[in-house]
Amino acid sequence: MAVMIKKSDFLGIPSEEYRGILSLRYQVFKRRLEWDLVSEDNLESDEYDNSNAEYIYACDDAEEVNGCWRLLPTTGDYMLKTVFPELLGDQVAPRDPNIVELSRFAVGKNSSKINNSASEITMKLFQAIYKHAVSQGITEYVTVTSIAIERFLKRIKVPCHRIGDKEIHLLGNTRSVVLSMPINDQFRKAVSN
């Protein structure tokens, strides 16, 4: 299976691919992780899926979406600032055109079970966010993520460190932290083939 990485903003994304992203997010966040999220017609979306959002996503040969990220500028509303400000402790939420929030990272479970390609999809998505950052002048990503993803980042040597109160928080059933991921040569080396 070939993995194609695509990038689009909210206004330009093809409708079938956008539905594929929302369907994957429903499968991962609502069904697998059992997050208490509003969904309709087996699709998960929220108020941050708006004209400020960009998407980096993976499709297979059949154009099925099997991995995705949502990117939000920190100059407007974004999840860490608006939904999870308590995770910041005494720290002020980043507000910088060169800092972008990553959210709704999802990789389809069926991809890894059927053809063992989840690792390839995951790595290609991380390569894509690195390349996107370099091309757009992004100097740092911030994200509220699971400690499993934090461990994964450390294992593949993507630079990251906890910010905010630096504590582990239970968000739904997911043990979560706030991470900063600086865009630097270490990140490039970690995601290079």
From Swiss-Prot:
Q: Where is the signal peptide?
A: none
Q: Which Gene3D superfamilies match?
A: 3.40.630.30
Q: Which PROSITE patterns match?
A: AUTOINDUCER_SYNTH_1, AUTOINDUCER_SYNTH_2
Keywords, alphabetical: Autoinducer synthesis, Luminescence, Quorum sensing, S-adenosyl-L-methionine, Transferase
**InterPro entries attached to this UniProt entry:** Acyl_CoA_acyltransferase, Autoind_synth_CS, Autoind_synthase
Mind listing the GO molecular function terms for this protein? Answer: N-acyl homoserine lactone synthase activity
Top EC category: transferase
Q: Name one GO biological process term.
A: quorum sensing
The EC number on file is: 2.3.1.184
Q: Which Pfam families match?
A: Autoind_synth (PF00765)
* Catalytically driven reaction(s): a fatty acyl-[ACP] + S-adenosyl-L-methionine = an N-acyl-L-homoserine lactone + S-methyl-5'-thioadenosine + holo-[ACP] + H(+)
| The keyword Repressor appears for this protein | no
Highest taxon of the lineage: Bacteria
Family that this chain belongs to:
Belongs to the autoinducer synthase family.
Any idea what job this protein has?
A: Required for the synthesis of OHHL (N-(3-oxohexanoyl)-L-homoserine lactone) also known as VAI or N-(beta-ketocaproyl)homoserine lactone or 3-oxo-N-(tetrahydro-2-oxo-3-furanyl)-hexanamide, an autoinducer molecule which binds to LuxR and thus acts in bioluminescence regulation.
Write down what this protein is called.
Acyl-homoserine-lactone synthase
Q: Which gene encodes it?
A: luxI
